[in-house]
């Protein structure tokens, strides 16, 4: 029961400058990310969507009430904060008319108002979110938010860590992994079909540096509701047990044995009370 309620701390992936990213290293980082998905990100996402540890507790005996009441404070915290924080879309402007025109066109093409809202919401849920940049099929700059469940940054190990790689991946309908690894110049495709391997030699992504930005909720990369997680679970358990008590007594019958009744039907004495 306790294991279900514990959320693992976030982890920053690093690699030393003298190490290269081969398929063995990539596989290791993906495995670590998948572990983090299970021990942290999935629990935070479940909390926001209203699926709490109480839903996974062992069922009580059939004759006992077994309410599982969820009061979704996590969603309330996230939505309320983001309503105040980014309810009014971000406005970007420039005194240079040509730059202003480009910014407006870039924002409209990439639906930046929606992207920014999703980045903010995901930061509040997971403690961080990524914004990825790419060149689309029309040779224009594309921008897309990436949830931390679907990708991760690998930083160098310097005093002020800088991104060295960005990895995104997904599984197709046949449970085959497909993904992309980006460094400061190239993007490489990989797959685990017939064994983990890179596909081709990679291609220039067209950006100066690793094409991603990490946004964080705070320096610790904690969810907006993470510090209240134990209280939310305790509240859900308390209110559920209270409902169980009410149901238990509502369904109970009073049986009186050995009562002495006079000619008017008034009880004179009771030998045993049994619930």
Question: Each predicted region: which residue ranges?
Answer:
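Extended, charged amphipathic alpha-helical segments
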Residues: 198-275
């Amino acid at each position: 029961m306790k294991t279900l309620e514990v959320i693992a701390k976030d982890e920053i992936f690093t690699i030393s400058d003298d190490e290269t990213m081969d398929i063995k290293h990539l596989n290791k980082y993906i495995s670590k990310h998948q572990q983090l998905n299970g021990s942290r990100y999935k629990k935070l996402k479940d909390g926001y969507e209203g699926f709490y540890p109480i839903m996974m507790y062992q069922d009580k005996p059939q004759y006992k009430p077994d309410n599982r009441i969820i009061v979704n404070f996590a969603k309330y915290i996230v939505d309320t904060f983001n309503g105040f924080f980014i309810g009014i879309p971000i406005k970007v402007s420039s005194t240079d008319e040509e730059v202003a025109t480009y910014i407006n066109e870039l924002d409209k093409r990439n639906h930046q108002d929606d992207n920014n809202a999703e980045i903010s919401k995901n930061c509040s849920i997971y403690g961080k979110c990524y914004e990825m940049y790419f060149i689309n099929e029309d040779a224009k700059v594309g921008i897309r938010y990436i949830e931390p469940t679907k990708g991760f940054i690998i930083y160098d190990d310097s005093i002020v860590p800088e991104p060295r790689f960005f990895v995104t991946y997904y599984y197709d309908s046949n449970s085959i992994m497909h993904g992309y690894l980006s460094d400061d110049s190239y993007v490489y495709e990989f797959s685990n079909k017939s064994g983990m391997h890179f596909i081709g030699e990679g291609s220039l992504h067209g950006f100066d540096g690793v094409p991603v930005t990490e946004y964080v909720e705070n320096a610790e990369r904690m969810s907006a509701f993470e510090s209240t997680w134990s209280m939310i679970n305790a509240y859900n358990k308390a209110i559920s047990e209270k409902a169980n008590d009410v149901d238990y007594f509502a369904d109970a019958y009073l049986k009186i044995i050995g009562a002495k009744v006079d000619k008017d039907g008034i009880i004179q004495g009771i030998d045993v009370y049994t619930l």
